[in-house]
């Protein structure tokens, strides 16, 4: 049962009241109340369940995200730059002299020496701005001794050979990158449809309007952006969040284009087209208008107070997590993400799609599995 149906048919909520919660699931699931299960949103303490007196904790048929939060997960612990610090920690472990420091606290503000990433004869080389365009075995996959990787860089194609290869890009592109994969595996890789998202960062000269209005975040279910918020305070190492409302700040705004009433994967495809066909001017106009209308009573003036805008278009955003409203309950080993991540000769697959979970730890677990498969081959 969807959350919308639950509010309408079980809670008997008024249609106008239900409208207030239509966009509430956007940030986690990329769909509205029509396409997320009531069980999943219960784990997030959405309204409508308090009288049921349900025991806390995850439950069967609950999605990955909901299960994690139901069992105590939280967004509280994160780096101020998101997953960038995790990537930088990995680079420092692989190429120690590329980044100063020794722990997670000092990595945020450390300056990377890009000249040390791709040095001849180094045991680890990271080649930036190099996009893989073809991966294939040198011969039959069952007996080949090498894998050829062709990549594009600076308008030219180059190739390298490797004893093994991990495809860590998102699943849907892999059948085009490696067309020699078995047809069943390629179909499984195409199954999921990543969640399209728009994340906007707006730099303000101060956050006095938030302070004077007594708010740090605003949920706006019928607006172009369903939410806007100041980032949570994160102090780590030499990085400190703003404390004074007279200091500059970044505001995070979220838009998730949906098509209510359709199955989730179809909504994501339509949302992706919406993102790719919308101009920056349209985003900017809506950003300025919504901030003026929301914060104007606190003295905010978009023309005066906005110093920069970054629109992050993420047409292929979060990994797809199976939705009990639309996806079957596959037997163990038969779900698309399990079929899609199967090792093929000297080629393995590892990403968040391979776990059907949009989280860093899930992607790291899949990387560990993929490398172990190749080392044991």
Predicted regions and their residues:
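Mid-domain catalytic core of redox enzymes
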Residues: 120, 124, 128-261
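Conserved aromatic-histidine-acidic binding/catalytic patches
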Residues: 71-82, 86, 157, 165, ...
């Amino acid at each position: 049962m969807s959350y919308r149906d639950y509010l309408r048919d079980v809670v008997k909520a008024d249609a106008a009241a239900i409208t207030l919660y239509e966009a509430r699931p956007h940030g986690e699931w990329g769909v509205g109340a029509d396409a997320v299960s009531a069980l999943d949103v219960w784990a997030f303490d959405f309204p409508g369940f308090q009288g049921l007196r349900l025991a806390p904790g995850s439950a069967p048929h609950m999605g990955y995200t909901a299960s994690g939060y139901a069992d105590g997960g939280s967004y509280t612990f994160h780096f101020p730059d998101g997953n960038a610090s995790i990537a930088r920690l990995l680079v420092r472990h692989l190429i120690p002299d590329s980044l100063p420091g020794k722990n997670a606290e000092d990595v945020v503000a450390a300056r990377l020496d890009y000249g040390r990433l791709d040095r001849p004869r180094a045991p680890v080389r990271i080649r930036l701005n190099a996009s893989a365009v073809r991966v294939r075995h040198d011969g039959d996959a069952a007996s080949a001794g090498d894998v050829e990787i062709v990549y594009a860089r600076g308008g030219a194609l180059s190739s390298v050979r490797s004893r093994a290869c991990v495809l860590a890009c998102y699943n849907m592109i892999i059948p085009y990158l490696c067309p020699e994969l078995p047809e069943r595996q390629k179909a499984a890789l195409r199954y999921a449809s990543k969640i399209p998202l728009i994340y906007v960062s707006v730099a303000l000269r101060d956050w006095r309007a938030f302070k004077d209005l007594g708010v740090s975040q605003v949920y706006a279910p019928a607006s172009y952006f369903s939410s806007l918020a100041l980032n949570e305070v994160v102090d780590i190492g030499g990085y400190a969040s703003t404390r004074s409302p007279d200091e500059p700040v970044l505001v995070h705004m979220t838009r998730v284009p949906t098509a209510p009433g359709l199955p989730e994967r179809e909504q994501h495809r339509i949302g992706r087209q919406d993102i790719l066909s919308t101009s920056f001017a349209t985003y900017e106009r809506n950003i300025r208008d919504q901030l003026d209308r929301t914060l104007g009573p606190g003295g905010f003036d978009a023309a005066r107070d906005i110093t920069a805008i970054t629109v992050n278009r993420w047409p292929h955003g979060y990994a797809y997590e199976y939705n009990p409203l639309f996806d079957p309950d596959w037997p163990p080993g038969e779900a698309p993400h399990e079929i899609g991540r199967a090792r093929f000769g000297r080629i393995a697959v590892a990403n968040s799609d391979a776990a059907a979970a949009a989280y860093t730890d899930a992607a790291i677990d899949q990387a560990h599995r993929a490398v172990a498969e190749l080392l044991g081959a």
